[in-house]
UniProtKB/Swiss-Prot annotation:
Residues 33-355 form the G-alpha domain. The lineage of its organism: Eukaryota, Metazoa, Ecdysozoa, Arthropoda, Crustacea. A lipid is attached at G2 (N-myristoyl glycine). It comes from Homarus americanus (American lobster). This is Guanine nucleotide-binding protein G(i) subunit alpha. The keyword Mitochondrion does not apply.
Length: 355
């Protein structure tokens, strides 16, 4: 009898042990399929645009209702951009070539101040169109490196006819280009190639960086985003600091941080489209006085790539995976993210001893 009870207890213990092993195996498989990505970079590098692309590429994109919710943001971004240009005309002592536009400018500020936030009335839109087409305004816009202006200014102001129409609903591209400062941490979840991604977008302005630290533990990879086009610009929060130099300092502190010895670093050199337009007019020596190459896209972009990759102090142990990106180009981001995922899968297999 005692023997039978002992056998039953042993059998029960064995079943329990088997279940625990199975649960542990399943938990391990789930953990292996979970990928935590930390999206880092200085302010206005394009991180939030990449998050929006993940929604478009790996989820269902933005519904009609969601796009409608972005209409006030589009209007606000457009109005604020034109305000920034006209204010800069005063600072840079640029006159309106057509003197009647000075009255339009005063009227524009009055109407914009009185309008509800995110509203664009027909009267306001017509004044904005006249101002935007004025040659003094265009001259000031071409000198935008001398003041703070959103990258999307020309995109929206060139589209005034379309966005001012009654019943306007922002397109996916309009939504991608909206600019709202990220504060705190935004988490996005999606699945791709049998992996479950958690993407953390962290505020890039200096005042936000202290909030990053508790995201660090257990991160699979860091995607560090740099605005290539920032090489001739200064920070919004510190007009003595060049944006590219600030990005390099931040990258150095992340890449060589003791917490990230085992963490894959993926470098997105972003806004390559704006950089390509800018580099022929604004030399790279503004940021890197020692640069002796030509001011063409390929040479200049590769020089910046080398400057960042050379900051890696553990080249023998750690590889930087660099990609040139345009965050507003869905096809480009889809292609690059596919390559990034393959690197993550390969590194996961290496960690498991299967590669």
């Amino acid at each position: 009898m005692g023997c039978a009870m002992s056998n039953a207890a042993d059998k029960e213990a064995a079943e329990r042990s088997k279940k625990i092993d199975k649960d542990l195996r399943l938990a391990g498989e789930r953990a292996a399929r979970e990928v935590k990505l930390l999206l880092l970079g200085a302010g206005e590098s394009g991180k939030s645009t990449i998050v929006k692309q993940m929604k478009i590429i790996h989820e269902t994109g933005y519904s009609r209702e969601e796009c409608e919710q972005y209409r006030p943001v589009v209007y606000s971004n457009t109005i604020q951009s034109l305000m920034a240009i006209i204010r800069a005309m005063g600072q840079l002592k640029i006159d309106f070539r057509d003197s009647s536009r000075a009255d339009d400018a005063r009227h524009f500020f009055t109407l914009a101040s009185a309008a509800d936030e995110g509203e664009l009335t027909p009267e306001l839109a017509n004044i904005m169109k006249r101002l935007w087409n004025e040659s003094g305004v265009q001259h000031c816009r071409n000198r935008s490196r001398e003041y703070q202006l959103n990258d999307t200014a020309a995109y929206y102001l060139n589209a005034l006819d379309r966005i001012a129409r009654p019943g306007y609903i922002p397109t996916q591209q309009d939504v991608l280009r909206t600019r709202v400062k990220t504060t705190g941490i935004v988490e996005t979840n999606f699945s791709f190639k049998n992996l479950n991604f958690k993407l953390f977008d962290v505020g890039g302005q200096r005042s936000e960086r202290k909030k990053w630290i508790h995201c660090f533990e257990g991160v699979t990879a860091i995607i560090f985003v740099v605005a290539l086009s920032g090489y001739d610009l200064v920070l919004a929060e510190d007009e003595e600091m060049n944006r590219m130099i600030e990005s390099m300092k931040l990258f150095d502190s992340i890449c060589n941080n003791k917490w990230f010895v085992e963490t894959s670093i993926i470098l997105f050199l972003n806004k390559k489209d704006l950089f390509e337009q800018k580099i022929t007019k604004s030399p790279l020596t503004i940021c890197f006085p020692e640069y002796q190459g030509s001011n063409v896209y390929e040479d200049s972009a590769n020089y910046i790539r080398m400057k960042f990759e050379n900051l890696n102090k553990r080249k023998d142990q750690k590889e930087i995976y660099t990609h040139f990106t345009c965050a507003t180009d869905t096809n480009n981001i889809q292609f690059v993210f596919d390559a990034v995922t393959d690197v993550i899968i390969k590194n996961n297999l290496k960690d498991c001893g299967l590669f």
